[in-house]
Amino acid sequence: KSNNMKAFTAFAPASIGNVSLGFDVLGAALAPVDGTKLGDEVEIKAAESFSLETVGRFAHKLPGDADSNIVTKCYHYFCEQMEKAGKTTSPVALTLHKNLPIGSGLGSSASSIVAAFAALNAYFDTPFDEDTLLIMMGELEGQISGSIHYDNVAPCYLGGMTLMTGSDAPVTLSLPLNDEWYYAVCYSGISVSTAAARDILPKQVEMATALTFG
């Protein structure tokens, strides 16, 4: 949404990746049954110089240095891609409403990334199409987790359940959902980063094990 002062707010929902046997390729966006918002928001408005403010329930869990925040990195990456495309940018003030717990398995980083890029793309008059923006989101997600994957950013950005294609166009396909499907999501309060979780996984899995457990 926006107002006459050219300020935008973008919301990005929580998501779950690695759905069932779809490791790194199948993800789903989450929406509470009571209609409340579950996700991060990013506000953007014009400024004389770039700034990032963090607010919200889990803002205190973020790096104290704004330059280390993924939203700041999204801004700089967006500006780099704009320059490559021969387009201009200007300084903005960003506010991240950090409403998702970090390292929770709810796509916390993806939510911040998607909200940031969606806000930036809207503010600068939509210079990038859906697939291009999604690839950019995957690049930034990869900076956090150690490898590019879309199973959180894709459903977070597009909604519903998404299947990654392995190509750049389209990056993902939307899968049909049954309106009567509901997910029970439990958060233990334990924080485990995506990078740490991936390091725990074995580098190889025997064929018999893979066939047995999918």
Give, region by region, the residue ranges found by the protein language model.
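Short, glycine/charged-enriched secondary-structure capping and boundary segments
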Residues: 24-27, 110, 200-201
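ATP-dependent small-molecule kinase catalytic core of the GHMP/sugar-kinase superfamily
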Residues: 129-214
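Predominant activation on well-ordered alpha-helical scaffold segments within soluble catalytic domains
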Residues: 39, 72-76, 114-121, 134, ...
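Short glycine/threonine-rich catalytic loop with a Thr-x-Gly-x-Asp
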Residues: 104-111, 207-212
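DPxDG-like acidic metal-binding loop motif
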Residues: 106-130, 157-159
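Short, conserved micro-motifs enriched in small and acidic residues
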Residues: 65-69, 106-114, 148
